[in-house]
Every structure is written in structure tokens, then in C-alpha cells.
């Protein structure tokens, strides 16, 4: 049995349509004191959302066959057009509107000061379920859930400590799929160096970086190679991150961070930086085919189509399906606070298609990746990262 790990150990458990588990009962334990949420906001408009320069923007729409359930969503500062986890999460909400007949509303945050105000505005409009998108809304969402026990909450890409049982974490063990990405990068590099960088040093970012580094290490052990990982030391948990302020939106900072890795010899980069990752795409495209990226969160060839020739594959998270299933659980009266943990085993995370790189990935590497995926899913390969979600 192969076992990879750095730092403290956190246990873990989980391309898309099968994330229907963990929505049945066992209430979560409520711990820690409630946190106060302040501020008030204008209720979401009864019009489709339009882009504005205001602090936040919102919309409230209903379907023709209403179910009586109102499901709502608040973005982080990257917004719903981030071509990443906010946009993917919103797709799940909009699918629920179409297929389940629920009414939906969304509010877009322009700064972190909007989080509490926006969630309160959704509470005030009588949402049955409020979905917060992203780790940065952690404390605000926990506080709101404690203050509003009759409202159901879910949070994407975060597992809050001390959350009440009306708050469901929707999280993904991307260490598993990033391990595959690391193995693939090590197999394809021509320079013997691959790289990764993050937006911020937070668990939902470093989980990718840990998995990626361990996948490279596994490839080296299997093949007797010495491919180097630049930008992240999984043992010391030190590495390259996009400069402040607003690192997930700092495209120029993402480009300069990627360029540093390219200058050091990396020819494949895994940017874990939201919209700032577009800077990495710009940097590799400028290399004239000498370097490429592995994208994260969503299929980059769909969300960043103009860069598809530079995207080998993507480490996806089934956020849209997880959001849809959370809404369905509310509609069906089966919602609870147990975390949903997407994994390779249930296709809640994985690698997307190779698209333009399909003919460039050797058949033996594709076969090896299938074996690696199977061995991770079965537990034969153990990946250990302090950032992995708790069961």
C-alpha cells in the first residue's frame, strides 16, 4: 500500500451525475457560541440580475412550475462570472430552478464587507435554503445559520467548525484528483520540472497543491525519476502565492507568479488561484507552446475556451451537482447538516477530458492514470493532507 503524507493527518471519505449521497439524516453537533451578524441590505430585486458597479448585485427569478421552495445563493468577491467555482455553483442553482420548479435568488458580493449584508437580505426575502459560495464566507455563514435556525444553509468549498445542523458543507477531496494531475504532469514534462501556486494559503487551495506534489512523488517512485515540484513544499507547507490585495482577482499577480515558475524551468503549472489563474494562462500562451497548465475547479476548455490549446486537463469539482442535490433535498424534505464530500469514488471530483491534448497523452499514461484513480478510490494509495475534509 502506498502512503503519502506531510504534516498533520486528517481523515477523508468522496464525472458528475452521481453525487446523491450524504443528504439523509444524522444531525450534526452544535458547538461554540454564536457570532453576531450586522448590517442590513436591500432585498434582492424581482428582476433578472444585471451587471452593476454597486457593492453587490442581486436577482430573484421564479419558474413557471413553482414547488413552493425558494433557494438562494450569495457569491464571494469573485462573482458569478468568475468562470470558476461561483459560476459552476450557480449553474446548479439554475438547474434546480428548471428541473425542480423552485424559485431562486442570487446576490453577488463585491467586497468581504458585503457577506453579512447579503446573507441577511436573503434571510429577509424568506429563502428556504441559502447557499454561500466559498471558504471566505465561513464565519458569516455559521453566524447566520445560528441566528436563523429555521432557515437551511449550505456552503460550497468549506467545512466550518462548530456549524449548526441547519448548515450543510459541500466539500470536495481534490487532493485525490490533484494527485492524478501531479502524476500526469510528471509523465508529460519535458524539463523535469512542474509547478503550482495558490491564491491564498487556505485549506481549499493547499489541498490541490498537496495532492499535486504527492502525485509527482508517486510517479517518481514508480518510474525511478526525479521530477521536481516548484512553488510548493508539501512537507513544510511553504510555497508561491499570488500577491495581495485580492489575490484571487489579481490576474497580473497570477501572471507574474506563473512567470517566476516558468523562469525556473517548469513547463506545466497547476494554478489554484481563481480568476488570477488567468494570468497563468496568459503566461503559458506567450511561451509559444513550450509550457501549459492543468486548470482547476471546472473544465477549463469550457470556461476558458480561448486557452484550450494550453490546458492539458482540469481538476474539476462537481459543485453544480452538489448544489442541485442540496436544493432537491430541501424540496424532498430530506435535508440535513451532514457534509457532502465529493471524491473520485462518486465522481464528485476528477480529471476532465484532455480535449486538444488527447493525442498528446500517451496510451500507457492514460492506462496508468486509470489504475491510479482506482487505487486512490479503493484506498490502496493513501493521500494525506491536513487540508482534506473531515468525514
Task: List PLM regions with ranges.
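Bacterial N-terminal signal peptides that target proteins for export
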Residues: 17-30
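Short, Lys/Arg-enriched N-terminal segments with co-localized hydrophobic residues
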Residues: 1-19
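A residue-level marker of the well-folded mature domains of exported/periplasmic proteins
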Residues: 41-391
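C-terminal motif of bacterial Sec signal peptides marking the signal peptidase cleavage site
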Residues: 36-39
Amino acid at each position: 500500500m502506498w502512503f503519502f503524507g506531510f504534516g498533520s493527518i486528517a481523515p477523508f471519505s468522496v464525472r458528475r451525475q452521481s453525487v446523491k449521497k450524504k443528504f439523509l439524516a444524522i444531525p450534526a453537533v452544535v458547538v461554540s457560541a454564536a457570532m453576531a451578524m450586522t448590517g442590513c441590505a436591500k432585498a434582492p430585486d424581482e428582476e433578472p440580475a444585471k451587471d452593476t458597479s454597486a457593492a453587490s448585485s442581486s436577482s430573484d427569478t421564479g419558474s413557471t412550475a413553482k414547488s413552493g421552495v425558494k433557494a438562494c445563493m450569495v457569491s464571494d468577491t469573485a462573482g458569478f462570472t468568475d468562470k470558476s467555482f461561483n459560476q459552476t455553483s450557480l449553474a446548479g442553482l439554475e438547474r434546480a430552478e428548471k428541473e425542480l420548479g423552485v424559485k431562486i435568488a442570487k446576490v453577488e458580493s463585491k467586497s468581504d464587507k458585503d457577506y453579512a449584508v447579503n446573507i441577511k437580505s436573503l434571510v429577509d426575502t424568506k429563502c428556504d435554503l441559502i447557499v454561500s459560495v466559498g471558504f471566505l464566507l465561513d464565519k458569516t455563514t455559521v453566524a447566520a445559520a445560528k441566528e436563523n435556525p429555521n432557515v437551511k444553509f449550505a456552503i460550497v468549498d468549506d467545512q466550518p467548525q462548530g456549524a449548526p445542523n441547519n448548515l450543510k458543507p459541500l466539500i470536495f477531496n481534490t487532493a485525490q484528483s490533484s494527485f492524478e494531475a501531479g502524476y500526469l504532469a510528471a509523465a508529460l514534462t519535458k524539463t523535469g520540472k512542474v509547478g503550482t501556486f495558490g491564491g491564498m494559503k487556505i485549506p481549499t487551495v493547499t489541498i490541490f497543491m498537496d495532492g499535486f506534489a504527492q502525485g509527482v512523488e508517486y510517479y517518481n517512485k514508480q518510474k525511478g525519476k526525479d521530477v521536481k515540484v516548484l512553488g510548493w513544499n508539501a512537507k513544510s507547507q511553504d510555497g508561491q502565492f499570488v500577491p495581495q490585495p485580492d489575490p484571487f482577482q489579481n490576474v497580473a499577480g497570477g501572471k507574474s507568479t506563473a512567470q517566476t515558475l516558468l523562469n525556473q524551468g517548469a513547463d506545466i503549472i497547476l494554478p489554484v488561484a481563481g480568476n488570477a489563474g488567468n494570468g497563468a494562462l496568459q503566461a503559458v500562451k506567450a511561451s509559444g507552446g513550450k509550457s501549459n497548465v492543468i486548470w482547476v475547479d471546472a473544465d477549463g476548455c469550457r470556461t476558458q475556451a480561448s486557452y484550450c490549446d494550453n490546458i492539458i486537463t482540469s481538476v474539476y469539482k462537481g459543485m453544480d451537482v452538489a448544489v442541485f442535490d442540496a436544493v432537491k433535498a430541501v424540496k424532498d424534505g430530506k435535508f440535513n447538516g451532514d457534509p457532502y464530500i465529493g471524491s473520485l469514488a462518486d465522481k464528485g471530483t476528477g480529471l476532465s477530458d484532455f480535449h486538444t491534448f488527447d493525442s498528446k497523452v500517451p496510451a500507457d499514461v492514460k492506462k496508468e492514470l486509470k489504475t491510479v484513480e482506482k487505487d486512490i478510490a479503493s484506498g490502496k494509495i493513501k493521500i494525506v493532507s491536513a487540508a482534506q475534509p473531515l468525514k
